[in-house]
Amino acid sequence: MSQELTLQQRMDGEAGSDPLRQAVKEAVAALARAAVDISDLTCRGALAGITGQAQGRNTDGDIQKDLDVRADQIIRDALGKLPIAALASEEMADLDILNPAAPICVAFDPLDGSSNINTNMSVGTIFSIMPTPSDVNAAFRQAGSAQLAAGFVVYGPQTSLVLTLGRGVDIFTLDRADRVFKLTGSSVQIPTDANEFAINASNRRHWDLPVRAYIDECLAGADGPCGKNFNMRWIGSLVAEAFRILIRGGIFLYPGDARDGYEEGRLVVYEAHPMAFIVEQAGGGASTGRKRVLDIVPDSLHQRVPLIMGSIKNVQRLEHMHTVPDVALEANAPLFGNRGLFRV
């Protein structure tokens, strides 16, 4: 791997003369250029007029910040003149049909984790590229396994772009001097087993039994069935959690729970599908607990599903608890439960 290999050079080598791959290359290049501009905005913060103030709510009911709106427009402007059949943004209610005869469709979350803006924590952009179906209106009513490419950008201490074209996962870092992304991690592999988990533990009382039982196993540490101690992480930014898992392994859980409006978890089109594609391409797993995320065919642009992703053995253990109820019941038995820090 050359430290000087740019994203453009990498994409040129992948695309060749194939028209479909050429379209993907152009879209990824445009998204990367947009990411540089968004990175500039996040770095300047209040100096660029970014206040983190709410601008209302988007289609999904999430509070929409000023940078959400600006990031959305930057990406739309970057993609608008390319051979793209349709665009879908988390910030918009409906599909934006551009050129139905074009070979690809692009979905994106322009600014994941925007609630972190005021606290100077990591935010990011997530994207998914699909082939155009015969009915362009069904562009994102396809299984996640149909994706041609997926990626995300983390705007943190460094700006990193994670990309899969369905043939492994690469990481590119923004060289601010040249304003281009350069390859810094090739064929990334997630450790098969790790002792970190990420979940918003304040919602424990709302989780279903398998999730509670799994987290209690982790908290029992070396004294429990896992036989080792675990660390908990929670940043509140999906892109930051995913990047850490790519580097160190572990498991991320955003389960559906009993709270009104939170029964179903993360957005399929804008979050779960692209993240699942990336994680699987890096040797990890992504599941709802009962079903592989990439097998899900969403029936709407803003459908949600529980999202569990990370090191394959960790994910498989939680899947086992969902599919074999007695395992979760046994793990939640009083003798074991007394060891859990969250038992009430």
Swiss-Prot record:
Coiled coil: none annotated. Its main location: cytoplasm. CDD domains: FBPase. It catalyses: beta-D-fructose 1,6-bisphosphate + H2O = beta-D-fructose 6-phosphate + phosphate. Mg(2+) 2 binds at D109, D112, E271. Pathway: Carbohydrate biosynthesis; gluconeogenesis. Its cofactor is Mg(2+). This is Fructose-1,6-bisphosphatase class 1.
